[in-house]
């Protein structure tokens, strides 16, 4: 894929990076990322993906912008309060980088919409505000073999990991029981969610381009109040209901059935012509 003169100039500083180059930039341009949540985490992730030149970004978030969102949601403006936040996010990203494509989905993640969203993506970023949506994204990414960058924070604490289906523990392995999570029950400082979001965006760029060493199979925990960072390897549960061995067998059978049904439908269409 050739770059336009504008693209070459726009991305010239990162193309200079050892191990990145034009090949890394091409991989970003050819990639589609889905970001669930467009808040202090997801919005900032999307900002740096857009700046880096990820070819298509799908933003998924229902609901309107609230005044108390503005301490951390840097894609928004005060004048947008009361309106669907995902559309303002799209506008801001395209103003930053009109060379990319941005799709705005003003919906919350549900069992009905998540598969269609994930199937379009080369990578997913889990920045949703509750674990119901996070678990749905995790399950879909495992089903369809899509890498997922998992990022979450509460107060001054945060964690980050990369989940590669079939290789690493999934979110259900890390949290076999859903954590108690009240979206209004903890304070949030914009600089904390922003710091985590920058690391999450970088993690995704690493996975897409091969730059550096991503956190595959490692969980990075952060206490940003004391600048304390630690890494550990979470347990990969062979009996996990989402990614365990038996689940993989069921998934393989499911995909084969889906492919067979697709071929049958195509055959039926041809026979009607």
Task: Name these PLM-found stretches.
Residues 264-267, 271:
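Serine residues within intrinsically disordered or low-complexity segments
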Residues 1-261, 273:
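Adenine nucleotide-associated cytosolic modules
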């Amino acid at each position: 894929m050739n770059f336009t003169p504008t693209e070459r100039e726009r991305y010239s500083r990162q193309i200079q990076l050892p191990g990145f180059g034009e090949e890394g930039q091409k991989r970003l341009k050819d990639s589609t990322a889905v970001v669930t949540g467009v808040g202090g985490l997801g919005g900032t992730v999307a900002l740096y993906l857009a700046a880096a030149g990820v070819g298509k970004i799908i933003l998924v978030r229902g609901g309107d912008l609230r005044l108390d969102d503005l301490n951390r949601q840097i894609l928004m403006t005060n004048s947008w309060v009361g309106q669907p936040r995902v559309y303002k996010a799209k506008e801001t990203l395209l103003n930053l980088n009109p060379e990319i494509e941005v799709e705005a989905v003003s919906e919350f993640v549900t069992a009905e919409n998540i598969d269609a969203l994930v199937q379009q993506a080369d990578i997913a970023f889990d920045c949703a505000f509750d674990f119901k949506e996070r678990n749905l994204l995790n399950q879909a990414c495992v089903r369809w073999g899509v890498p997922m960058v998992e990022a979450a924070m509460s107060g001054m604490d945060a964690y980050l990991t990369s989940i590669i289906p079939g290789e690493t523990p999934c979110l259900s392995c890390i949290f076999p029981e859903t954590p108690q999570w009240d979206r209004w029950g903890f304070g949030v400082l914009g600089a904390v969610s922003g710091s985590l979001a920058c690391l999450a965006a970088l993690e995704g760029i690493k996975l897409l381009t091969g730059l550096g060493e991503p956190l595959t199979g490692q969980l990075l925990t952060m206490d940003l109040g004391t600048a304390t960072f630690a890494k550990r390897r979470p347990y990969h549960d062979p009996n996990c209901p989402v990614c365990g061995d038996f689940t993989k067998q069921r998934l393989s059978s499911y995909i084969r059935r889906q492919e067979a049904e697709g071929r049958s439908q195509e055959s039926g269409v041809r026979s009607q012509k």
